[in-house]
Amino acid sequence: GAFSSKPNTNPSPTIGKELVYEGYAEKGPSINIGGYPAGTKGARFSIYSMTDGKQYGRGTFYLSCLVNFSKLGANGMADFLGLSASYVGGSNRANIYVAREGSDRIRFGTSLLKVKAETTMAYDYDKTHLLVLKLDYANQKVSLFVDPELSAEEPAEASCIAEGDAENVLKHAIRALSFRNRSGFIGNVGNFRWCNSW
């Protein structure tokens, strides 16, 4: 950053190309994932505060976005988006993950605190995917839909579901969206939508 002896080792996110998914209404530029100088390791968080209140702490909420990855730098599931209970970030209640599947495919996953779930299907690199993350406070579930049918009705089955337990309870209100820019990754994320209905 600007106040380190090695400026720009973990750069701020930059504006990327517009992502398009047929039937999805949200438009505009994306955020570049990656862009670190060669040899740089680590990650940088950017926090996008939504509220300092508790209005997003009961009922059901949906975060949707478009993503397109051309390279993944980590082995295993790596988070890149999170919903935080803190106005300034941290304390994520739910995350969206991505992982390599062999040499030419990727998988996605989600979490409810420490409970994780992964998709059984694999998806293509260099293709724009629609992700819809559902937080269901009443039923203690976080669901991830990957490339769902865009209709008025929520699909009957999610791509993966993380269910709460005695130690992992969805109870704190969401106050911010957290983006984790990782070294070794190349891609884009954007076209966000936050709402209380499908």
Question: Where does each model-flagged region fall?
Answer:
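Extracellular glycan-recognition surfaces and repeat-rich motifs
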Residues: G1-N32
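Secretory/extracellular carbohydrate-interaction modules
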Residues: Y24-R105
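Predominantly extracellular/luminal cell-surface or secreted proteins
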Residues: Y62-S64, S84-S86, S143-E149, C195-S197
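Short tryptophan-centered beta-strand motifs in secreted/extracellular beta-sheet-rich domains
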Residues: L63-C65, D126-L135, V142-L144
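Short beta-strand segments enriched in hydrophobic/aromatic residues
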Residues: V67-F69, R100, L135-Y137, P148, ...
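Surface-exposed loop/edge segments in extracytoplasmic proteins
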Residues: G90-A94, K114-T119, L150-C160
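Short, aromatic/His-centered strand-loop micro-motif at the edge of beta-sheets
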Residues: R107-L130
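Flexible glycan-contacting loops in extracellular carbohydrate-active proteins
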Residues: P155-R193
